[in-house]
């Protein structure tokens, strides 16, 4: 960095420390990833200076010719990537994308079905602390107590009973394949609209490693980071018949000017995801996650639902007498970054939790393969087996540092 150290040494120091944290720790938060230098360059471009309210060819400001080119490329690439008729690349986040869809098909007080946050859903799917649970009437569905997989019979029963206007499929802490076709059958029976939130699995969907809801559902939303390896942002996919209402719900409905530098970075990420190498990347993400789950099972830990079909693993640490917060904080001390997470039918409050959520996208981007992930999994188990012994913590931290030195982060920095 050339100018920041002098202009704002405090911010510069914090950014350098963050570089060091990412370099010296194993990033295993399932919703995080590392963007390429090309994405980072687009993100830090002079497009951050440009206001471009409206849409390509229909702006409220002059001087938007280049912004139009950028947004049009992002739209076309998103449509190609997911096989969609329509794409809106302006949402600032996945939460904004979800809210735009709600505004497009629901009125205040209308009921909708969404996955229970405590069972792996997302707070924007009807949590009482979120606007989705305050303006509308959410009806939560969950997982089966024995299999810990989505209970489609319960969804059908709730749909018949409540006749919701919208059914939301998608999760933030669910490791199994989602059967979108079953959701479609249920929605058709009760006359409900369908929204799929594929924020976590969009990379798997775009490469064919998870069934796609595009063309089957009325609306599909996603973030552009996580498995897509783009900047933090949102995306809406739908059919052309919904273009007018969705565009108006994003702008001027819930947003003003789009973040054009972010949209430029989204366009770059979409182009990267259209390349053959990206499909190979997702293949390794999945192999790494399966390896991680297998290590945990072999070491006597309980993996929620018994394994994984995607990029994440939900681990029940209560079997070792730990809470999620104890496990996550302890792992952080030895250089492994995860997050505490509730597990289905958790007896602990969310702020404490009984589980941790681990993901493989970031480490796969960094270059780790299944053999490396086996080592990582064993290091995690070594720590959790004896989290309070200083000698054990020191040994595990040394193992983590061996891996981070083997896979440096230079390729993800601009300087």
UniProtKB/Swiss-Prot annotation:
Cofactor names: pyridoxal 5'-phosphate
CDD domains: SHMT (cd00378)
Modification N6-(pyridoxal phosphate)lysine occurs at: 226
Residues annotated as site: Plays an important role in substrate specificity: 225
CC annotations in GO: cytosol
One Pfam family, short name: SHMT
Pathway linked to the protein: One-carbon metabolism; tetrahydrofolate interconversion; Amino-acid biosynthesis; glycine biosynthesis; glycine from L-serine: step 1/1
Main location group: cytoplasm
UniProt similarity note: Belongs to the SHMT family.
HAMAP family from the UniProt entry: SHMT
Job description of the protein: Catalyzes the reversible interconversion of serine and glycine with tetrahydrofolate (THF) serving as the one-carbon carrier. This reaction serves as the major source of one-carbon groups required for the biosynthesis of purines, thymidylate, methionine, and other important biomolecules. Also exhibits THF-independent aldolase activity toward beta-hydroxyamino acids, producing glycine and aldehydes, via a retro-aldol mechanism.
Assembly mode: Homodimer.
Name used for this protein in its record: Serine hydroxymethyltransferase
């Amino acid at each position: 960095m050339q100018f920041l150290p002098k202009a704002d040494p405090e911010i510069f120091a914090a950014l350098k420390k963050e570089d060091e944290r990412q370099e010296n720790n194993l990033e295993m938060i399932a919703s995080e990833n590392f963007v390429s230098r090309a994405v980072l360059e687009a993100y830090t471009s002079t497009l951050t200076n440009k206001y471009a309210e409206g849409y390509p060819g229909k702006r409220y400001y002059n001087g938007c010719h280049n912004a139009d080119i950028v947004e049009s490329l992002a739209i076309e690439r998103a449509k190609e990537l997911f096989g969609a008729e329509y794409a809106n690349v302006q949402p600032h986040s996945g939460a904004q994308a979800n809210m735009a869809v709600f505004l497009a098909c629901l009125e205040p007080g209308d009921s909708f079905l969404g996955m229970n946050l405590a069972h792996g859903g997302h707070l924007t799917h009807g949590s009482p602390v979120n606007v989705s649970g305050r303006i509308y009437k959410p009806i939560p569905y969950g997982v089966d107590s024995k299999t810990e997989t989505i209970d489609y019979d319960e969804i059908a029963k709730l749909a018949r009973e409540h006749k919701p206007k919208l059914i939301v499929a998608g999760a933030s802490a669910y490791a199994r394949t989602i059967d979108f076709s079953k959701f479609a059958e249920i929605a058709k029976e009760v006359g409900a609209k369908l929204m799929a939130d594929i924020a976590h699995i969009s990379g798997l969907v775009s490469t064919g490693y998870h069934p796609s809801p595009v063309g089957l559902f009325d609306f599909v939303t996603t973030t552009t980071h996580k498995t897509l390896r783009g900047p933090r942002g949102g995306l809406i996919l739908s059919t052309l018949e919904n273009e007018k209402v969705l565009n108006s719900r994003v702008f001027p409905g819930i947003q003003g000017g789009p973040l054009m530098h972010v949209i430029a970075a989204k366009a770059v990420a979409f182009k990267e995801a259209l390349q053959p190498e990206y499909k190979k990347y997702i293949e390794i993400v999945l192999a790494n996650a399966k390896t991680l789950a297998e290590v945990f099972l072999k070491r006597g830990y309980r993996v929620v639902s018994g394994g994984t079909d995607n990029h994440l693993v939900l681990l029940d640490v209560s079997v070792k007498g730990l809470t999620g917060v104890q496990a996550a904080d302890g792992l952080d001390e030895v250089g492994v970054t995860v997050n505490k997470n509730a597990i289905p039918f958790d007896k602990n409050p969310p702020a404490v939790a009984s589980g941790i959520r681990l993901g493989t996208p970031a480490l796969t981007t960094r270059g780790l393969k299944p053999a490396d992930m086996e080592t990582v999994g064993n290091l995690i188990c070594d720590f959790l087996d004896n989290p309070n012994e200083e000698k054990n913590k020191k040994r595990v931290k040394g193992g983590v540092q061996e891996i981070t030195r083997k896979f440096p982060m230079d390729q993800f920095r601009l300087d």
